[in-house]
Amino acid sequence: MQYRSLTFEEIEILESNSCWAEDWSRVEVAEDGFQAKFFHRVMFYGDIQLGSFQKEVEITKGFVKHSGINDATLRNVTVGNDCLIEKVGNYINNYTIGDDCLISNISVMETTEGATYGEGNLISVLNEVGDGNVIFFHDLNSQFAAFMVKHFNDKDLKNAIRRLVKEEIARTNPERGTIGNNVKIVNTREITNTVIQDDCEISGASRLSDCTILSSEYASVYIGTGVICENSIISDGSSIVNSVKMQDCFVGEACQISNGFTASQSVFFANSFMSNGEACAAFCGPFCASHHKSSLLIGGMFSFYNAGSGTNFSNHAYKMGPMHWGILERGTKTASGSYLLMPATIGTFSVCFGKLMHHPNTTALPFSYLIAEADKMYLVPGRNITTVGLYRDIRKWPKRDMRPQQTQKSIVNFDWLSPYSVGEILQGKKILENLRQASGDNVSSYNYHEYVINATSLRKGIKYYDIALRIYMGAVLKRAHKWGFFGKPQTEIGLGRWNDLSGLLLPVSEERRLIEDVKSGSLETIEEVVNRFREINENYRIYQWAWTYRMILEYYGINEITPEDDARIKRDYIEARRAWIAEIKKDAEKEYEMGDVDREVFESFVNSLDHEVDFEN
């Protein structure tokens, strides 16, 4: 924008409207469109730049005021075109304000020396008293954060990532606080050292200090009444409302945090929903949900997670400090009143009931129920595979992704059966078969570590795991035909173990390659690292086929997939899928018989199950 000095006539108008300047020569205005008559009772200090003031601004639906500045003190401020700024109780200091903004009834807004806007903040998740394992920056996604948490004990990698982040921040951080275009800030007390991007609305917040709000035209951010937010970054499409208190947190895209939720040293990504409760040193990956006042998420890594009321974790043995932590793998739930003593690792898509005290590690028995009754711990392997809850979950998550295409930083792979989870299922099936072989069939229960597995549960577990394996192989084979890569895989990438980096499913070999490329300097910028995550995700189906092809050969004891084998796998797939749907229908009928499920709801669900045959071919 081109600026000019004020004319003598404009200064006269301003002064007649009770405006005052420390030095009128340091007040510059837009060459076109500046109108002094829309300024009343304004005090100018330092260097001031003012845009044009020609349009009206909508205050609320059906109520407009002309743009201008009234009842405000400004020091070293640039104001864009057609803003309305009024009722500033204290002052605005060292800020750049964009076009078409409404700022009304605020106390103070300023940038102080050394402001970082929440960028570069190093926090410790999982281990509450650790050295720090997540660095905040505006392009952080769930993969990058999980990668840091997992590997920051590698000092060379940690130093390399810190250097990349430092360079990115130095390149992008503004010299002073900025307010984007179309921003609305009303009835707010204090905004300090905060960058607020386009189309954000802040209404009634108490304090925003050292924050970056990554709002955008396609996914605006809303900050509501009573919110206190310090040393944090809030991403596109999120809302923080109703007296949330947050320190040292990163909030990813389309998250909702509300109703007095308190959080410190935690990260939340991609459509997570947090209300009423508390989080401390928690890593909440995509689609985490906690609704209840009495739930505490502490020292844990979660994704696709649902916390029942009264869920609690203990990261403290009252000896060496609150340093213990655990991982609840993708899709895990904790029932009402559940408690987990860290350290612990819970396998994918499991459900925890009661007070689990013996540091369980069930990664090799996924989709299980873990049940504590008095001093006994029961494990029901594979039970969750055939529940209504799992069926609803795996279908609802893709529909509930509220992130516009333009703002999807975190990668979310929705496959519930993947080389990662199926690898665990293969281990689980083998463990159950070995237990059965070791103790025989004529026993009432089996022991697995501290857990008791009833004989009927073990037999059903083997059956359910096998159903899942056949569904997986058939589905991948069908996709290989459809996408044209059926036959011997063209790559060995994908063989071996797989991991879940908070939504990104990838071969361990690719994760190791990424570590080496960051350490060696082959990846020279944050953008290149983020692009590598995207590249791995784009090749997911190819890597998956390499892994699944080998699995099919081993499962069926064949050397290649002949047309006869292909037909057999398809038959097994259809048979397994129908058995799976039949078990889910039984689970739904059992719940309906409890008497409080509306018949229409039950029939609608059963009808959706009946349509599953449409997806067999």
Over which residues does each language-model region extend?
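Long, charge-dense tracts
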Residues: 90-91, 95-102, 107-117, 121-123, ...
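Long, compositionally biased intrinsically disordered regions
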Residues: 113, 373-617
